[in-house]
Amino acid sequence: MARVTVEDCLENVDNRFELVMVASKRARQLATGGEDAKVPLEGDKVTVVALREIAENLINAKNVDQQKRPLHEF
């Protein structure tokens, strides 16, 4: 379980506000089953997984809204 820092994530998003918005949207997608994680879960909570995805530049502000949503959100 690698530690994720805000600085790691800020290399891939514009500012802290955007980081919070992207991470919260992605964590909700993961928690509700809308999309599979793009990194190994390793027993981490969905918020940590979301931050790891952002730090590895797998999720960003442009593509977080393009991820699949569960049917109950329509």
Swiss-Prot record:
**Reaction(s) catalyzed by this protein?**
RNA(n) + a ribonucleoside 5'-triphosphate = RNA(n+1) + diphosphate
Task: State the Gene Ontology terms under molecular function.
Answer: DNA binding; DNA-directed RNA polymerase activity
Q: What's an example Gene Ontology biological process for this entry?
A: DNA-templated transcription
Q: Which SUPFAM superfamilies match?
A: RPB6/omega subunit-like
- The top EC class, named as a word, is transferase
Q: Which Pfam families match?
A: RNA_pol_Rpb6
Question: EC no.?
Answer: 2.7.7.6
Listed A to Z, the keywords are: DNA-directed RNA polymerase, Nucleotidyltransferase, Transcription, Transferase
Q: Record's superkingdom?
A: Bacteria
GO cellular component terms? DNA-directed RNA polymerase complex
Protein's job? Promotes RNA polymerase assembly. Latches the N- and C-terminal regions of the beta' subunit thereby facilitating its interaction with the beta and alpha subunits.
Family membership, please give it: Belongs to the RNA polymerase subunit omega family.
**What do we know about how this protein assembles, alone or with others?**
The RNAP catalytic core consists of 2 alpha, 1 beta, 1 beta' and 1 omega subunit. When a sigma factor is associated with the core the holoenzyme is formed, which can initiate transcription.
Task: Return the protein name.
Answer: DNA-directed RNA polymerase subunit omega
